[in-house]
């Protein structure tokens, strides 16, 4: 018996994310309609969740109480650990 590997998805258009600053640990999904779970980003990161257009995706594992960096500065703090490839939405953050 072999372990199942997660299914990956290739959207009709190549996945496009925007990382505003080199220190950022999240990127913004720019594809019209967002990206489905399983999408492989150019970096090789696989999305764990469907991420709507204009929303953030974790580029690395984000530890509980750690900062979410956008534009190189904290925009919020993680309430519980968020794995890389996950949708980072406001319900998961303490806002400054």
Which functions belong to the PLM regions below?
Residues 1-96:
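Well-ordered secondary-structure scaffolds
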């Amino acid at each position: 018996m072999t372990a199942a590997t997660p299914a990956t998805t290739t959207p009709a258009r190549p996945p496009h994310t925007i990382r505003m600053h080199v220190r950022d640990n999240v990127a913004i999904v720019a594809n019209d309609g967002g990206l489905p779970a399983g999408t492989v980003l150019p970096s090789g990161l696989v999305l764990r969740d469907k991420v709507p257009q204009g929303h953030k995706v974790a580029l690395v594992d984000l530890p509980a109480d750690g900062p979410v960096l956008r534009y190189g500065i904290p925009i919020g703090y993680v309430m519980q650990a968020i794995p890389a490839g996950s949708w980072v939405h406001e319900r998961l953050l303490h806002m400054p």
